[in-house]
Amino acid sequence: QTCVSCVNFGNGFCGDNCGNSWACSGC
């Protein structure tokens, strides 16, 4: 499984597909 650098989940949060998430303004 490859981790993506950033996926915008909306609601001010981004993450990858490896279980990590963080607050963000956009990707």
Curated annotation (Swiss-Prot):
Task: Give residues where Pyrrolidone carboxylic acid occurs.
Answer: 1
Keyword check for Glycoprotein, yes or no.
Answer: yes
Where is this protein found? Secreted
Query: Does the entry annotate any disulfide bonds, and if so which pairs?
Result: 3-18, 6-27, 14-24
Provide the residues annotated with a glycan attachment (glycosylation): 2
Cellular component per GO? extracellular region
Keyword Disulfide bond, does the record have it?
yes
Assigned keywords, A-Z: Disulfide bond, Glycoprotein, Pyrrolidone carboxylic acid, Secreted, Toxin
Superkingdom of this entry's organism?
Eukaryota
Q: Please outline how this chain is modified post-translation.
A: O-glycosylated with 3-O-methyl-O-alpha-D-mannopyranosyl.
Where the protein is mainly located, per its record?
secreted
Q: Which GO terms describe its molecular function?
A: toxin activity
* Transmembrane intervals: none
Q: What does this protein do?
A: Toxin, essential for pathogenicity. Causes symptoms of Corynespora leaf fall disease (CLF) in rubber trees, including chlorosis, development of brown spots and necrosis. Alters leaf cell ultrastructure, causing plasmolysis in most cell types. In extreme cases the plasmolysis leads to disruption of the plasma membrane. Also affects chloroplast structure, causing lamellae distortion and reduced thylakoids stacking together. Causes accumulation of starch grains. Does not affect the nucleus or mitochondria.
Protein name from the UniProt record? Cassiicolin
The species this protein belongs to is Corynespora cassiicola (Target leaf spot disease fungus)
